[in-house]
Amino acid sequence: MATALVLGYSAFDLGLFSDKDPRLKLIKKAIRKDLEAMAADGVSWLVFTGSLGFEYWVLEVAQEMKTEYGFQLATIFAFETHGENWNEDNQMKLSRFKQVDFVKYAYPRYEHKGQLRDYQQFLLENTNSSYLFYDEENETKLAYFYQKMKNQEDYFIKRLTFDQLNELAENFSEN
């Protein structure tokens, strides 16, 4: 059973502040294409951390594909307090992360930075691959986690990059 951890840029990192942004259609098209390939490679579980942006968009697409491709979806939040201060729209998105096949919380609340390190290690040890929207040339807080993934033995990383999106956009506009 192949399990992929889903991580990537936040909507804020990408400057996408509206669910109606036309760039989302292209991003979701790339996600669908990648998820189809991952399903063909045997990925059956997608594991989320509950972040808005790329993770949420993958969740939306995976839920659309769930019946046809048999995906199982899990959200493992770092803390039970995750998202409690979010606005109403984001609370609705958070509720979708909680309406999956498996939901757990690593800790009741944040107490010290060691919890995040242990949480990341737990995620790496309990998945055997990742689906990551991350480009080393556009670093964010994911840089440390990405490095840990690369150092993890026998850990497959499927990346979506800006170059791939640009190529898809060029092909999309030609058709």
Curated annotation (Swiss-Prot):
Belongs to the UPF0398 family. It holds the Pfam family YpsA. It comes from Streptococcus pneumoniae (strain Hungary19A-6). It comes from the Bacteria. HAMAP family: UPF0398. This is UPF0398 protein SPH_0478.
